[in-house]
Amino acid sequence: DQGFNSWG
């Protein structure tokens, strides 16, 4: 998770 996406 990169922080802005909740699926990554």
Swiss-Prot record:
Compartments where found: Secreted
Origin superkingdom: Eukaryota
GO BP, one annotated term: neuropeptide signaling pathway
Transmembrane segments: none
Keyword entries, A-Z: Amidation, Neuropeptide, Secreted
Cellular component terms (Gene Ontology): extracellular region
Residues bearing PTM Glycine amide: 8
Name the record gives this protein: Leucokinin-3
Source species: Rhyparobia maderae (Madeira cockroach)
